[in-house]
UniProtKB/Swiss-Prot annotation:
This is Tryptophan synthase alpha chain. GO terms for molecular function: tryptophan synthase activity. Its EC number is 4.2.1.20. It comes from Geobacter sp. (strain M21). Belongs to the TrpA family. It comes from the Bacteria. Keywords: Amino-acid biosynthesis, Aromatic amino acid biosynthesis, Lyase, Tryptophan biosynthesis. One of its GO terms (cellular component) is cytosol. It is an enzyme of class 4 (lyase). Pathway: Amino-acid biosynthesis; L-tryptophan biosynthesis; L-tryptophan from chorismate: step 5/5. The active site is at 49 (proton acceptor), 60 (proton acceptor). Tetramer of two alpha and two beta chains.
């Protein structure tokens, strides 16, 4: 079993849902990211998604776009992110997902990247702009290296799309809760629970829900239906306001509150 499968299995045994936290690697620099990942885990994150900064992040709203810009300005590269994960693996076994766009992976070389990512200790890749029907080469590479490849479902995904993602995905399935780009929203969609329950019934893999979840209350509401909850933009906003030890303290407090919300929704 992979680290991700192990984590979901242990959570299920305890009757808990997963809190998945997203931050951009290299915002404001990779040394800070290393400390942030350890703090996220300490505060209650069950899995960590590291965003790979990209100059044209089409699926991301302004908060994560600005975060990506800050990371690129600090000189963050894909090889440097893999070195960061290697350092983290000396200190933590928290499952780590690299989330980003295909262009940097293509430039690196799919097979070489999958191998290097696995060697560094990455657990999974989530490539936002690579649908399963275009992912054969990368999937072959990730399968051979023991990496999970995570695909997206959206509110407009029909049953055939759900079936395709169920066949080709591994680790977990990421359900995008809203149409549009990433970003915090004031409320969860009225029909989200029913739709998530419907999709989840067609899957063997865990289903996590992300995009737009920004409060402990929303996290708890989503956790009632899903296997896990992803919080990204609401966390990334802290990087606009705080630095150093204060950033870690503020992030830790918020993640602890999110975890309590998820636990409440798990019951």
């Amino acid at each position: 079993m992979s680290r991700i499968s192990d984590r979901f299995a242990s959570l299920k045994e305890r009757g808990e849902k997963a809190l998945v936290t997203f931050v951009t690697a290299g915002d404001p620099d990779l040394a800070t990211t290393e400390k942030v990942v350890l703090e996220l885990e300490r505060a209650g994150a069950d899995l960590v998604e590291l965003g790979v900064p990209f100059s044209d992040p089409m699926a991301d709203g302004p908060t994560i776009q600005l975060s990506s810009d800050r990371a690129l300005a600090s000189g963050t590269t894909l090889p440097a992110i893999l070195e960061l994960v290697s350092r983290l693996r000396e200190k933590t076994q928290v499952p780590i997902v690299l989330m980003g766009y295909f262009n940097p992976i293509f430039a690196y070389g799919s097979e070489r990247f999958a191998f290097d990512a696995a060697q560094a200790g990455v657990d999974a890749l989530l490539v936002v702009d690579l649908p399963p029907e275009e992912a054969a080469e990368l999937k072959g590479a990730t399968d051979s290296c023991g990496l999970d490849l995570i695909f997206l479902l959206t509110p407009t995904s029909d049953s055939s799309r759900v079936a395709m993602v169920a066949r080709q995905g591994s680790g977990f399935i990421y359900y995008v809760s809203v149409t549009g780009v990433t970003g915090a929203r004031s409320a969860v969609a009225d029909d989200l629970a029913a739709r998530v329950t419907e999709v989840r019934g067609a899957l063997e893999l865990p289903l996590v829900v992300g995009f737009g979840i920004s409060t402990p209350e929303q996290a708890g509401e989503v956790a009632q239906a899903a296997d896990g909850v992803v919080v990204g933009s609401a966390l990334v906003k802290y990087f606009e306001k705080y630095q150093g030890a204060e950033l870690l303290e503020q992030l830790g407090g918020f993640v602890s509150a999110l975890k309590q919300g998820v636990l409440k929704g798990s019951r």
